[in-house]
Every structure is written in C-alpha cells, then in structure tokens.
Amino acid sequence: MGQVLPLVTRQGDRIAIVSGLRTPFARQATAFHGIPAVDLGKMVVGELLARTEIPAEVIEQLVFGQVVQMPEAPNIAREIVLGTGMNVHTDAYSVSRACATSFQAVANVAESLMAGTIRAGIAGGADSSSVLPIGVSKKLARVLVDVNKARTMSQRLKLFSRLRLRDLMPVPPAVAEYSTGLRMGDTAEQMAKTYGITREQQDALAHRSHQRAAQAWSEGKLKEEVMTAFIPPYKQPLVEDNNIRGNSSLADYAKLRPAFDRKHGTVTAANSTPLTDGAAAVILMTESRAKELGLVPLGYLRSYAFTAIDVWQDMLLGPAWSTPLALERAGLTMGDLTLIDMHEAFAAQTLANIQLLGSERFARDVLGRAHATGEVDESKFNVLGGSIAYGHPFAATGARMITQTLHELRRRGGGFGLVTACAAGGLGAAMVLEAE
C-alpha cells in the first residue's frame, strides 16, 4: 500500500462535514423550468444556513460550481453570497470539473481548512438544463462585433448582407466533447462493447436504481436532506425528485430504442441519467470549530483523489482509476468500506467500472498495481439508488452523494463510505468519508 495522506489541519483537526442539503431534482423543463442555476444555488444555500442556524459571519468561504455556464452570472458562488444574506465579506469563487464539480468544491474548501486560512466554508453546485445559454453562429457573432465598430449605416448594412439564413439559427450548448466530437452516450456505447455489457444488464441496473430510490423516499430516508422547493407561481411546492419511476417493471425498459447507436446500440434513455435541474451544498468545518459551535458532524472527509485519462476510448472510467488512489490515501481497502456510492451516468459506464475494480488484469496492465482494487459487494453498492433514478444536475451530484452517504452511514452505526464519479474530459473523482 502507498502513502497514507491524513486530511487534518496543522493542529490535528479532522475535516468535518456538519450538514448537507439539496433541492429536489427535477427533469429538464418540468418543475424548475425557467429557474436559472444561480437561483437554485441561492435556494439551497439559504435554506441550509436557516436550518443549521449558523451565524452568517461563521462561514468564511463559499466554493460553488456550475457546468452549464450562464454568461450573465459567471461567478455563481459570489452571486449566491450576495443573494442569500451572507456576510458580504465572505470569500467566494466558482469551480468547474464537469460531473465532478462539487467534488472539486469540497476538496477546495477542505484544502483551505487544512491550510488554516478558514475554519468554516460551504461547497456545492447547481445546474439547470432548462435555462440554457443559447448562442449564435460564429459568423453572426463576428458580424455583430464588427457592426459595433462600424461608423456608418452603410458599413453596418454591408456587414449584415454577408449573412445567410443558416447563420441566424440559434446554437444550443455543445453536447459533445470538444476534443473528440463524441457524445457521452457514444462513450457509453464504446464501454458496453469493450466490456461485453448487455442491454439486459444495463436495464436491470437502471431498474434497481429506480426501485432503491423509490424505496428510500417511501421509507422517509431522504426527507432530512432534501428541502421543499417553492417556485413561481408558488401554487404547489416541489417536495420530492420527479424522475423516479417507482412503479415501472423491467419489461418496460426493453421497449425503448437505443438513443445513440440506433442500429446496434444498447444505451437507451431509460438506462441513462436524464437531463436534470437542481442544487446541493454541504458545510465543512475544522473539527474544533464544530465543537465550539456545539455542532455534531455528519461525518468526516478521510481522503480524496482526482484522475485523468485519454478521451478517445472508454473515457468514463474515472471510478476505476480514482478509487484505488483515494483508498490508498485513506489507508483502507475495499473490504473496509461500509457503503459504495458510484455516480450512474449510464448503466454501461457503471457496470464497466464495477468490472474493472475487481479486475486483476486491469490493475496490473493498466494501473501498474500488484492487485485489483477489489470486488464491489452488491449489498453495499448504491443502496439508495443512484443518478439514473434521482437525475443528474451536473454540478450538484457530488454534494448529493456525499450527504446521502453520510446520512446512511449514520443510520448503520457509522463506518467508511466511498463516493466516486466519472466526468467529461476523461476525469475521475473519489472521496472516502467516515461517520461515527
């Protein structure tokens, strides 16, 4: 085993996660239609502070992220500070690491705590797939810049005359990798073919995710960590996630056609996570600061790791790469874990990562390690369902997973939990959490 890297301050304090909260997650263009990510972020941070009754001056830093950037609010973190009644002097900056954005926000706040520059901070993320930055074509954009500099009407008209009808069409945000042109679903199809993952296996995992999430809601396990959202025109509150299919049967999944490889594919809308709106945040403190304030932590951040691989083939292997590093830094093995929560971008991606975590060949030939990371115990894995069921507001998912895992660890009497995710650009993230 490699070097253990304890996450403690210079005074020996552990990094405590004292509270976490999220909005309900809503499918694109449903309950949060028209609500921008910055407002979702304000909503969850404001409610989190109200529930914990932590004085505004205690929070010294807010690190927040969004993946679908809005030009009018490029620093979402600072807008949240200014829009929630927090101390105006609170440091705030924004981060983006695709689907691992709130993992990065948590790591940044943890590093500030370890450096001693702060003693308490908030980390999180928000995204809206319903309020999108619809752009213009490159040709129209260039003409508009030139028109702004033109001195006469004739010069302006001459510039506009260069445009064709197709140049006036709106341009939606890109859904493909900038460097490869591949969509996430294309990569999921690659992984299904590379690792021999069948349509039936993918549908079974998706069905399991929805069944577990529906059960978690029906048993009241999520009520404490999901706020009620009141949205214009304030006629009906949103209380629960609206993507979960609690009454579906496995046979229903087989009816859908492939979404990406139309002829030979196995990835469908049902075994993939949907476009989603929502926000989530956690409060982190040094252990001693939490004690000063009389707060009982949900748990502690034991370790974290970020990795990056090539983007051309099977790039959503972040969990298989980052998990062994995070476990190594925590001084733990897979067998020591009480819970494992893996982001389900696609069922194919999830099953491929599970397969590789237990692969001796992958460990030896690809990671350069002597042994496999370890088999994933199904009884510990995504026990409350995952992103396929809950949805995936890109920047919020990590904070959801952290909060959800810590609450479940406490219900089980404590232990260690792994949260891990893949992300666009071949990125991966993993964190080990501890609850007492």
From Swiss-Prot:
SUPFAM superfamilies: Thiolase-like (SSF53901). The gene is fadI. One of its GO terms (cellular component) is cytosol. Heterotetramer of two alpha chains (FadJ) and two beta chains (FadI). Transmembrane segments: none annotated. HAMAP family: FadI (MF_01618). Pathway: Lipid metabolism; fatty acid beta-oxidation. Belongs to the thiolase-like superfamily. Thiolase family. It comes from Escherichia coli O1:K1 / APEC. GO terms for biological process: fatty acid beta-oxidation. Keywords: Acyltransferase, Cytoplasm, Fatty acid metabolism, Lipid degradation, Lipid metabolism, Transferase. Its EC number is 2.3.1.16. InterPro entries: Ac-CoA_C-AcTrfase_FadI (IPR012806), Thiolase (IPR002155), Thiolase-like (IPR016039), Thiolase_acyl_enz_int_AS (IPR020615), Thiolase_AS (IPR020610), Thiolase_C (IPR020617), Thiolase_CS (IPR020613), Thiolase_N (IPR020616). Gene3D superfamilies: 3.40.47.10. This is 3-ketoacyl-CoA thiolase.
